[in-house]
Every structure is written in C-alpha cells, then in structure tokens.
Regions:
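Alpha-helical linker/hinge and terminal dimerization helices associated
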Residues: 32, 36-39, 76, 119, ...
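Charged, amphipathic alpha-helical coiled-coil/dimerization segments
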Residues: 88-146
C-alpha cells in the first residue's frame, strides 16, 4: 500500500503535475518521520536513548568493534558538529567510550561499553516487539524500507 503510494507520487512528479499537500512525497516522509520520532522517543525512554543515539548504537552493535568517529559519522550521515555532542551524551550515560588511536593521535575511536553490549539484545527486541505489530506486516515493512532506500540512493 505504501509502495503503491510512493510509486504514484513518483509518476506524478515525473509528469510535473501540480498536487495537493497530501500528494507530496516530501510531506508524507516528513509526517512519517515526525510520527516515528515521537514513537521512538516513548519506546526508547526506558533506556535513556534518543532515536539518533539508538541509530548510533545500532551501527556500533553491527560492527562489534571500535570504530573511527569519522567512519561512524559517514555511516550515520552526520557531520562532526552533530556527532560530537551525541557521543558526549552516550559516553556520559555509559554506552560508549572514546579513545585516541595509538598510531594516529588525531584519530578518535568509539567503542561499546560492557553496559552497551549487555543491553543490545534487550533494546533490539524491545524495539522490534513495539514497531512491527502496530505499523505493518514484516514484508510490508521490508518493502517500505527498500523503496525509501531506492529514493535516497538516487
């Protein structure tokens, strides 16, 4: 259903037809993003994480190794002005530690703490249990994610 909506919007954009606000892809994405941010703020509250902190943790959990701050920023599509305060808060809350690379002192490495490692399974399953049942089926969810990446990768 969402995929059909996006494809219809794409066809309308290609034809340069004027549209109503509800027909605009940008507004649909904006509205959905607001809804997800509100939802995630409630779900993640028990862990003291924001949505952006959660996505940062997902990348670190995925890698399961120390990462350069630059590499983390590239993966999250965040600049250092946004990433540094975010990492400061995660470090203060005990989720990550930062250390200078011994070989290159200019390079800062971010690494998971024992707290982060021990809570990984709990956080991921809590999110999954909350998100999938109320939003859509798992196959609809996958299809939606794929369509959004098709758009953002162009």
């Amino acid at each position: 259903m969402l995929v059909v909506y996006f494809k219809t919007l794409q066809q309308n954009l290609l034809k340069h037809k004027p549209s109503h606000l509800e027909d605009e892809l940008c507004f649909a994405v904006y509205s959905t993003q607001k809804l997800y941010n509100r939802f995630y703020s409630i779900v993640l509250k028990r862990y003291g994480l924001t949505y952006v902190q959660y996505t940062t943790m997902l990348v670190l959990w995925e890698k399961q190794r120390p990462m350069m701050v630059k590499e983390l920023g590239e993966r999250l599509k965040l600049d250092s002005g946004t990433l540094t305060p975010l990492l400061n808060r995660l470090e203060k809350q005990g989720w990550v530690v930062r250390n200078r690379n011994f070989e290159d002192g200019r390079c800062v490495m971010v690494e998971l703490t024992p707290k982060a490692l021990s809570l990984e399974h709990d956080v991921k399953h809590h999110i999954q249990d909350c998100v999938l049942p109320i939003v859509m089926t798992e196959s609809e969810y996958r299809e939606c994610v794929n369509v959004l990446y098709e758009i953002s990768d162009k």
